[in-house]
């Protein structure tokens, strides 16, 4: 069935499903409109008049007249008014007015489609074990990551358009902080953080040098280690800046969800969900993984509990389970955000003075209209973690089995095919075969340059970095909302 075969059929079927079925059955829409989320409606001006004890006024002498029309003063009411907001379940009609709803729906539904394609491809590879096919599910995962980063970039740019500049300063500050943090992490020896980045880069550099030598080119390598780490740190600083406000918002929703939760099991799950990025970070700390998990000290001797391959598999499964937990707790966090409308009204009642009815209505309505922005800030990091883990499993040559039958060897053989390996076919009909052979040899050379060692080190670091950024920003947000703001 060609170069891609069955995988191409799966991709075409999924594209058809996205076009025909998802507009009618959408997970993104169901997460918001399943009846569990309730939003607060802003009161009408007539209701506010009745609560304030004011009657509908006609034209009075106090009204100022400009150019033939009457300009009424804005209606104001006391801030300590006895106002109780009415709630309503989120419906599909309500979502039409939400900011960023199309982006939210596209990201979630495309992620679901990409995950299904990945699962089908994994089943296909486990049974058929093809060796000459391109794994097209990797393209889907890369597209998901690109869409998630694009959405986070779009949300971050809005903070730079605000005239006050407070949010812009926060993004820039955290960006520089994460750049310094990334440079510090990249110079730490692998005795503490076992990404395998040093080994992977060394293997990549040696393979690239050997490939260039076989092409008759003299080179000391494609890029120096310092340059590689510098550009990687710049990329990490951008990721950290994009994840700044999602982490800060998560901290506020976590505190509100804890106050809203009444059952102990819900509170426990909320705590685990908040600490999930920390658990992911600790999975790559070598003193913990090597000394206490893989080789726990039992008496005077340390007994090997599992192999490195088994621990790598357990690490993948744990990250996926924590991602599933975060998705399951999404409803609690979004409802905690929607409750901010009533919380703002309660806070207003404690203040003295008056407020215009228009400002009050905007204050209440603004919470619901930005629901999808908050949902994107919650979902996008989750999507990045999940599909970065899937890429790590496939490109890093890991296994899903806890006890694999045989270890998956990492190809480190640098014997690359030479230029003269192309067979010469003098007949004109053989030109197509020559082209196919050249493409095959080129792909084989690329596989020998970009080895699983490189992908394992790079993707392990990026997965760890996303979790570290989330935990750092959410921890700062927890401290800020708990101690630096007035409740």
Swiss-Prot record:
It is found in: Cell membrane. One of its GO terms (biological process) is regulation of heart rate. GO terms for cellular component: plasma membrane. Pfam families: Tmemb_161AB (PF10268). It comes from the Eukaryota. Its main location: membrane. Keywords: Cell membrane, Glycoprotein, Membrane, Transmembrane, Transmembrane helix. The chain crosses the membrane at residues 107-127, 136-156, 169-189, 228-248, 265-285, 305-325, 367-387, 459-479. Glycans are attached at residues 34, 135, 203. Disruption phenotype: Knockout mice are perinatal lethal and isolated embryonic cardiomyocytes exhibit arrhythmic calcium oscillations. It is a multi-pass membrane protein. Belongs to the TMEM161 family. Essential for maintaining normal cardiac rhythm in the developing heart and for neonatal survival. Inhibits potassium and calcium currents in the cardiomyocytes, this assists in timely action potential repolarization and thereby maintains normal cardiac rhythm. This is Transmembrane protein 161B. It comes from Mus musculus (Mouse).
């Amino acid at each position: 069935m060609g170069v891609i075969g069955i995988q191409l059929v799966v991709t075409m079927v999924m594209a058809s499903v996205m076009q025909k079925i998802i507009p009618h059955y959408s997970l993104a829409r169901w997460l918001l409109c399943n009846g569990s989320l309730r939003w607060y409606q802003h009161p009408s001006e007539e209701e506010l008049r009745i609560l304030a004890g004011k009657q509908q006024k006609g034209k009075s002498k106090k009204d100022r007249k400009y150019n033939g029309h009457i300009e009424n003063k804005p209606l104001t009411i006391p801030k300590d008014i006895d106002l109780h907001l009415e709630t309503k379940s989120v419906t599909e009609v309500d979502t039409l007015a939400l900011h960023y709803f199309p982006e939210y729906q596209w990201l979630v539904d495309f992620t679901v489609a990409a995950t299904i394609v990945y699962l089908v491809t994994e089943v296909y590879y486990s049974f058929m074990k093809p060796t000459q096919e391109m794994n097209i599910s990797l393209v889907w995962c890369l597209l998901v990551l690109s869409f998630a980063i694009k959405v986070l970039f779009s949300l971050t740019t809005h903070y730079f358009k605000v005239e006050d500049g407070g949010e812009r300063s926060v993004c820039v500050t955290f960006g520089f902080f994460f750049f310094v943090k990334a440079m510090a992490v990249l110079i730490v020896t692998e005795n503490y953080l076992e990404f395998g980045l040093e080994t992977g880069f060394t293997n990549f550099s040696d393979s690239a040098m050997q490939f260039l030598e076989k092409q008759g080119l003299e080179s000391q390598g494609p890029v120096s280690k310092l340059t590689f780490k510098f550009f990687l740190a710049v990329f990490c600083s951008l990721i950290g800046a994009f994840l700044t406000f999602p982490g800060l918002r998560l901290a506020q929703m976590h505190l509100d969800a804890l106050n809203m939760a009444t059952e102990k099991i819900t509170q426990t799950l909320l705590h685990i969900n908040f600490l999930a990025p920390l658990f992911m970070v600790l999975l790559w700390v070598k003193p913990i993984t090597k000394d206490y998990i893989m080789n726990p000290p039992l008496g005077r001797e340390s007994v090997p509990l599992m192999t490195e391959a088994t621990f790598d598999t357990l690490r993948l499964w744990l990250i996926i389970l924590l991602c599933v937990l975060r998705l399951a707790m999404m409803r609690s966090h979004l409802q905690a955000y929607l409750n901010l409308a009533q919380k703002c009204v309660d806070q207003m009642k404690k203040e003295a003075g008056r407020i215009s009815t228009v400002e009050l209505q905007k204050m209440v309505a603004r919470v619901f209209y930005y629901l999808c922005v908050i949902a994107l800030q919650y979902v996008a990091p989750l999507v990045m973690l999940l599909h970065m883990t899937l890429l790590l499993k496939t490109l890093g040559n890991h296994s899903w089995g806890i006890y694999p039958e045989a270890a998956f060897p990492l190809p480190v053989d640098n014997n690359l095919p030479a230029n003269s390996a192309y067979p010469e076919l003098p007949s004109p009909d053989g030109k197509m075969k020559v082209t196919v052979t050249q493409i095959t040899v080129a792909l084989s050379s690329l596989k020998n340059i970009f080895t699983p060692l490189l992908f394992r080190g790079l993707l392990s670091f990026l997965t760890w970095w996303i979790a570290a950024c989330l935990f750092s920003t959410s921890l700062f947000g927890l401290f800020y909302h708990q101690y630096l703001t007035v409740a």
